[in-house]
Amino acid sequence: MTGRNGPALSAVITLAVVFGLLLNTAMNESKANQAHATKTLEQRVSALLGEMTLAEKIGQMNQVNASDHEINDHLREAIGAGRVGSILNQVDVDAVNELQRIAVQESRLGIPLLVGRDVIHGFKTVMPIPLGQAATWNADIVREGARVAAREAATAGINWTFAPMIDISRDARWGRIAESLGEDPYLASALAAAMVEGFQGEDLADRGTIAACAKHFAGYGAAESGRDYATTNIPENELRNVYLRPFRAAVDAGVVTLMAAFSDLNGVPATGNEFLMRQVLRDEWGFDGFVVSDWDSVRQLAIHGLTENDKESVYQAVMAGVDMEMAGESYLDQLEDLIGEGRIDVAMIDAMVANILRVKFQLGLFEHPYTNPAELPAIANEHALQTARQAALESVVLLKNDRGVLPLSAEKLNSVAIIGPLADAPYEQLGTWIFDGDTELSITPMHAIHSLVGHELDVRYLRAMENSRSRASVSFDEAVEIARESDAVILFLGEESILSGEAHSRADISLPGDQAELVRRIRETGKPVVAVILAGRPLTLTNIVNHVDAILFAWHPGTMGGPAIADLLFGVESPSGKLPATFPRMVGQIPIYYNQKNTGKPPSPDTVVHIDDIDAHAPQLSFGMTAFHLDAGYTPLYAFGHGLSYADFEYRNIEVSASEIGLGDTLIVSAELMNTGDVAAEEVVQLYVRDLVANVTRPVKELKGFKRVRLEPGRTITVDFQLHTDDLAFFGRNMQRMTEAGQFHVWIGGSSETELRTEFRVVDKD
């Protein structure tokens, strides 16, 4: 097996096994292709369903964990008996092919298996974490990253990934924000669609494509206190206007599976939530793929307190619309009895099994159940690594650059100190959810900097801390000495990958351990200090931001993060990432996000009073009286959409094509963008809108468009956006989507804090 006997032997075994399987099945496949040529997809589904026994139907609704390299007798027997429709976590291609052989050749009807895996942001070649990919604001690179991941995963026989994770999250304490696409529904929707397209390709039956799974449906990212699995309470209006939008975009992009969330939504756990999966997903959106539970979440309905036992949990999940159970046997154990008792109609089971079979047919599994890695692109090929590098490059956000400290110049410096626990950490830079990521492929920042400038200047390296959480500071004196002897210092700080992801929420999201103390000690040397931060979430950086000259926020950048960071530090490229989530000043500001409501008492700079400026005996109503915190104000440390460049971009002359448009019409909004700096660079131009008066209160700003443009020094271009009145639609009091006539403000700029604004009016043509 791969990883035990070595890649060469594994390749020989794989080819031999596959060749034998292909010889045995080629004639059968040819006959099957001819027989199915004149049948439509639905006819094929219906015909197969008509041949199935009830036990075989229930088997298709059962997914089994098959992570052991050795195939046990119980699994062989279950697949051969038609009691398994899908396996997950088996990544040895020989084992996968053998399990497919059992399903195709030994089961009565020969129905192939879905093979699932969490391929979240890469397989062997790892892209930046999804939150980092969202910082690219580039659907093309996100799509291609998913495409690379699909091709690599397919070499292991995987045909289904549990991605993209598209939960909106406004709470950086939540560990799974690392897997998300940020806080904004417009940006998340655009990138969700791109990921689905990347995984699934133009035709699911093509070799190297895999089924995508949009998760977690729905509201999981709004967990109370940012604690994973915690309760979520989201009013239906907000649910529809914010949290459901990326899922609708994924469905519109053709995603074939969804995963129900673990969490309790408004009193009903998502796994048992008929409103979500039948009313919204099926009836309103017309989804015809299938829904899978999260790991053992059917059984957990009883733990929530929604049901009394496993049997009632199965009843609730099936009635709600969960087509397949992941990693549990409750469906196998209970469904037949529930049907026999007349509580669940077999017609409902038929419809659910049809959803699963439909995806198997779409994937072409009946024609091509086996995997031959030789038919697919090589793992970690040049294109894959270049895609990972470009994604990392575009994901890094320049938060701060006082006095133009960056980029560093190898010509002007004689030496540079690289200090910190994450400068040379090949595993940590990959981020969370990298079951299959290959650390041998990782190029760390320290090695990349040596490669880029080591021949021109003296590069000195000290880890200084064992890991990001270390409290011992015995190496700090040595770090200070190295810093004093160097012309500039690059600190690699942040959090290890294990501190984010599922079940890894944090109450304090500042730099862990003694990192802030390390920053303070290095600052005292008086040398220019650049902080490069690797993390799986936005962090509160208030305690270090004034002690460093520049900050590059690199997320967990993946396999090629090192070369990307080195290129940015030394000016080979200019940073172009923009924040997909707000950075709070203090954790107590959470949830903090740019598209909040105005309230009846909106804060402004002249209404904010700091806690230290209040007299001890001041009367209660003598100050403020607006929505802010006494100790943090109301603004974030860094706003959504923020990201600096080595170029200087100037926005001016915002215009609309008409001051008034009718419902159903399109408006052109444009502004001039000038590069007044000395270097060519890319900028993400952002369009925001505010609906001033509406059926329900609306956000103070909403992202409605973005474009990534490259501009040479001294050049000016006009950037325009088309804005249709449908783009202004929202769900009102009656939960119906509508666009209302009225006055709108519109902004164009480089972040959500842009002040370049004009306005227009929408009128009812009637």
Give residue ranges: language-model regions.
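Bacterial N-terminal signal peptides that target proteins for export
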Residues: 1-13
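Hydrophobic membrane-insertion alpha-helices, especially the h-region
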Residues: 12-20
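Glycoside hydrolase catalytic-domain context in secreted enzymes
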Residues: 20-725, 729, 741-752, 759, ...
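Surface-exposed, short loops/turns at beta-strand junctions within beta-sandwich domains
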Residues: 737-739
